[in-house]
Amino acid sequence: MSKWKTIVVGIDGSPPSRTALTWAATEAADHGADLVVLTVWERTLLPPMGSGGVPRSPLPDPSQRATEDLLTVIKAELGEDPPVPVHPLVKQGNAAQVLIKQSADADLLVVGTRGRGGFRGLVLGSVSQHVAAYAKCPVTVVR
């Protein structure tokens, strides 16, 4: 049995992050660890604009939307009754920085190869590269 007690997986809803989620859940089940499923939203500087340059209203609460999206992905990938304790976590900020900070409380950090942004030709996205270089715990990049 492993010493892992907490596995953190970063997801953004992209196919690679969904694969990372299912991989991390399997590892957590195999090692008797809790699974923290983390998503990060970044504040946009400008609200969505309607016609005439007038902001659309009402503006959705990005934290609430991120939470709803996170719970939807967890349910879609792990089902109604996941095989491990799952702790959804929503944070605001830069994804790489938030994941690195969260890695201080983890025994393993799991990310997908690429997220929603970036260039299609890259094997690793900028977030996964940055996290792999600076995390405070071991990192697994799932393909």
Language-model segments: residues:
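General small-molecule cofactor/ligand-binding pocket signal
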Residues: 36-38, 87-91, 140
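Structural beta-alpha unit
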Residues: 1-3, 16, 30, 76-109
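Histidine-centered beta-alpha loop that forms part of the nucleotide-sugar donor binding/catalytic region
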Residues: 12, 93, 114-116
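Gly/Ser-rich helix-loop-strand patches that form or flank binding pockets
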Residues: 101-143
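Hydrophobic structural packing positions in well-ordered secondary structure
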Residues: 7, 24, 35, 99, ...
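A short acidic, glycine-rich active-site loop
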Residues: 55-69
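Small/aliphatic-rich secondary-structure junction motif
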Residues: 2-54
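Short, hinge-like loop/turn segments at secondary-structure boundaries
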Residues: 52-56, 106-107
